[in-house]
Every structure is written in C-alpha cells, then in structure tokens.
Amino acid sequence: MEVIQPTTQIFADNEKTVSQVAEEISSNELRETTVYLPDLFVSFCSRAPKTNPYYAEVKAESDAWFAKLYSLSTEKELSRLTKADFALFAAWWTADAGKSEFRTICDWCNWVFYFDDQFDEGHLCEDEAKAQREADILTQIMTVGLRDDEYPDDLPRARALRYAFRSVWERISQRASAGVQRRFREAMQEFCKGLVGQVGVRADIDTRELDPYLAFRRQSIGVVPCIVFAEYYHDLRLPDEFFEHPSVKTIMDLAAEITVLHNDVLSYHKEYEMGAIHNIVIILRERGMTQQEAYNETDKLIQKRLREWHLAVNQLPFYGEALDLQVQKFVQACQEVAVGNLHWSFATERYFGNQNNLIRKTRQVELIDLKA
C-alpha cells in the first residue's frame, strides 16, 4: 500500500511550507481582485494641511444652523451631515481664517454640497429648464436680492437653500471689497453654469478630447469660489490686473482640474454604481482600458498639471514687497484647496466607508468588472 507522506514533506523539495503556499495563493487572489490607486499625495499635496483653530466650535454651530434651516430631522439625515464633515474640509484650506470668516465659509460649504445634490441626484438632475431657473435665482440673490415671500410654491428645501445662500452672500457683501464681491459673483455664476451644463449634456457630452472635457468639468467642481474665499478671509487687496494675468488664470484652472482628477479617482466606485458618466476613470474604461490602466492614465494627467503649475508660478508678475506677499498667500490658497480636499476625502467615509484609513495606507481598492 502506498504511504502518504505528511503534507509538509510534499513541499520539502521546494523548501516551502503549507502556510507559505497558502500565503502565495491568497496573494495571487488579491492581485486578481484589487488594483492600486495612484499616489495622489505628491508635490505640494504631500504636505499635511493645518486645521483652523475654530474648527470644532464652528462645526457645531454651522451644522446646527443648517440642519434647522434645511429641516434635517431624522437620525439618518443628521448623521449624514455630521459624518460628511464639510467643516473639516473648510478647516483644511482656511487654517488662518478668523472665527467669523470661518463660520461664513462653513455655512457656504454645507450649503454648496446640498445645492449640488439637487443637480446630481435630486429634482433638477433631469430637468434643464428647472436647473437653469435655480441658477438664475442664485444670480438674482447676488444682484437685486431675494424676498422671503418670493417663489412660495417651490419646494420648501429648495427655498431653504436659497435663504442659506442669501445669508452667506449678505455676510460677504458686508465685509469684502467690491473686487472680491464681483469675483465671487462671477465664480458662482460659472459654478452654476457648469452644474446646469451637466444636466443638459448627460447623454451626449463629447469626451473624445480630455483637455476640453476637463475645462468643462472644472466649472462645476466649485474650486474657484473657494479660492475667492481666500481673498475674503485674508483681506487681500490685489489689483484687478493681477487676475487678468495668464499665469494667474492658469493656476486657478489647474487647482480646479487637479481637484477634479483627484475626485474622479477616489469616487470611481461610488459613481460607477450610480451610473454616473462625468468621471475620467469611467470614460477611460469605456475606451477599453483596464481599471489599473485608467488609474495610471489619470495619474499622468495629474502629474502633467503639477508640472504646469510650477511653470505658471514662475511666470507670475512682481509688484513689490507688499503686494508680492499677498500674491504668495493667494498662490498658497490655491494649493490648499486641492490639498484640503484630498486629505478630507480620506479623513471621512465619503468614498470608502470604514475602509478609508486602510485604503489610504495600502492604496488597494476593489477591481470592478464592467457590466455587459
């Protein structure tokens, strides 16, 4: 009768134990079901953001104010607001803002994410005419004002969002220079244009050329209003000609595009499940790339923009000591919006749930098999 040797002896010639082979099998299976995110924490995004010292206090105040105004009453609704932690997002790109200015920015952050939801998943996502009307009302608030009794038949939460924005705008108007007010107004109009544009072209957006597509996407990402807020809380007094300089426009565009690309990498799983189309990774996979190839290609787009950033900074104009100090604060603020957004995306459970810290460490995420 044949004698069966102990299992460990079977692998003696290869000097591998059962546990070692099991580890190899497990490792192979892992490689087949996971892929690696790009290393997004590079260049200026490698530094950890500072936190506004008023973060905890103002978060509690702002969340309570918005929850009451927007009638968030269920445990699920309140938990969503608290866990999203939009105040932390703000705290990481406004570390030097005073309490009053930081409160205004936190209120805007709470407002903007719920306002954006109307266009992404809410009652405006399939109705371009109603989406445009909502954008027009926002412009009305910043130009001729909005009375409490206007549009009484609209949805209560839509009206609540308008009044929240009106409150923010009134606080900005009381403190900011005419130039900051104008740039904020223009930034918000561009933001709304991007939101409405996404509603209108969901089915037929031309994604063949990525650079024009990213130019389209940067409108709706909301980065430029954040940059204008830096002028607001730093009380910058830069001349209008500064904002017309090509390098300044390039820096602002790049800050927005880097943020878009970061978000698209991190939100891919969530947006794929939702059936979203406005995501670079989704677009690249539709072109035949694997998930890893799409991540790698997106990483190249990010690195290209980081290199362009440094070139643009080197072309900034000089104005003398006093104004050049303000220029440096402005440039740093543009960086901090992208840095803060990236770190916040991993600090909360927005994209990866309770696996956020592990994925931040390993960069390994689940491989998605495309649906037929």
Curated annotation (Swiss-Prot):
Binding site for Mg(2+) 3: N263, S267, E271
Essential cofactor(s): Mg(2+)
Family matches, as Pfam families: Terpene_syn_C_2
EC number: 4.2.3.-
Entry-linked SUPFAM superfamilies: Terpenoid synthases
Keywords recorded for this protein, A-Z: Lyase, Magnesium, Metal-binding
Family matches, as InterPro entries: Isoprenoid_synthase_dom_sf (IPR008949), Terpene_cyclase-like_2 (IPR034686)
Pathway note: Secondary metabolite biosynthesis; terpenoid biosynthesis
Stated family: Belongs to the terpene synthase family.
The protein's role, per its UniProt record: Sesquiterpene cyclase; part of the gene cluster that mediates the biosynthesis of penifulvin A, a potent insecticidal sesquiterpene that features a [5.5.5.6]dioxafenestrane ring. Within the pathway, peniA catalyzes the first step and generates the angular triquinane scaffold silphinene via cyclization of the linear farnesyl pyrophosphate (FPP). The cytochrome P450 monooxygenase peniB and the flavin-dependent monooxygenase peniC then catalyze a series of oxidation reactions to transform silphinene into penifulvin A.
Protein name in the entry: Silphinene synthase peniA
Species per Swiss-Prot/TrEMBL record: Penicillium patulum (Penicillium griseofulvum)
